[in-house]
Amino acid sequence: MKISKQVYLLDGEESYLKKQYKDRLSKAMLPEGDTMNYAYYEGKGTDVKQVIDLAETLPFFAPRRLIVMEDTGFFKSASPELSEYIRSMPETACFLFVESEVDKRGKLYKAVKEKGRIVEMTRQDGATLQKWVLSMIQKEGKQITQSA
C-alpha cells in the first residue's frame, strides 16, 4: 500500500472495515514494531494541544511519526486549532482519524479533504457481505455452497 497523504479520515458505521484499514495504514506508514513513532488517542477527552505538540516532535530514527485518533469527536465539535494546523503540518507527521460521526460542513473535515484522504465506510448490505465472505473463503483455497 502506497502512502501518498499525510492525513486520513476513516469515517462511518462499519467498524470492521475501519479496523482493517486502520491496521493496513499503520503498517504501511511505520516499520513493524516501531512503537517510538506511534501514538494512539481515543475518546472525547483527547487534548488537541498535546496532539499538535507530538506532531511537532521529530520522529525517532524514522521518516515519519503516526498519530492515530479514534472517536475523539473533533469532527462534531469545532476544533479550529487542529484544522489550521493540518494545513501547515510538518512532512514528518501523519494523522489517522477514525470516527463514527463527522460534520461534513466543519472546518476540520474541509481541511482533511484538502490535505488528505477521506474514506467513508457505510454499513454493508447482505449481498455485499456475501460476496466478501465468498472471496475470503476462496483466498484460503476453500469452497462453500450457496445453501451453507
Residue ranges of model-derived segments:
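Conserved beta/loop motifs at nucleotide-recognition and modification sites
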Residues: 1-148
